[in-house]
């Protein structure tokens, strides 16, 4: 499994934004990352200043890199329906909120909680609890 470092993740987002603004072609995951960045105009200024934000620690505030990385993970899960049933659960969220970004953020809450619990418990993520969370938010 590919596990990029904090620096690699940040450089990917900075590079994606730089290429987009320069009109350069994007490759691979950069295309998906750009879609996420475009959903978050509040991050554009930060992404345009890598020298200022590259090494910043986010302790008491929302970490934009973590947020966008969770978006990437969720988009990948949806594209392959893994865990099985996530795509159907997301469609229910989409129907409920009638807004793609709002539905994604509802799902991100469940993903973040699942990751947090797995790290806390030093265990694998609980797919059943993850899907249950999505279903609860969709109802």
Model-derived features with residue positions:
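N-terminal leader/targeting peptides and immediately adjacent processing regions
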Residues: 1-39, 44
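Amphipathic alpha-helical protein-interaction segments
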Residues: 111-112, 116-119
């Amino acid at each position: 499994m590919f596990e990029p470092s904090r620096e690699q993740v940040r450089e990917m987002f900075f590079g994606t934004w730089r290429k987009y603004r320069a009109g350069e072609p994007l490759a691979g995951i950069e295309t998906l990352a750009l879609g996420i960045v475009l959903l978050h105009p509040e991050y554009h200024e930060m992404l345009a200043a890598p020298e200022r934000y590259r090494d910043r620690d986010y302790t008491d505030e929302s970490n934009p890199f973590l947020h966008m990385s969770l978006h990437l993970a969720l988009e990948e899960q949806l594209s392959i329906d893994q865990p099985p049933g996530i795509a159907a659960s997301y469609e229910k969220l989409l129907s409920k909120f009638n807004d793609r970004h709002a539905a994604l953020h509802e799902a991100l809450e469940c993903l973040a909680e699942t990751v947090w619990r797995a790290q806390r418990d030093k265990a694998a993520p609980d797919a059943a609890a993850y899907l249950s969370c999505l279903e609860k938010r969709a109802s």
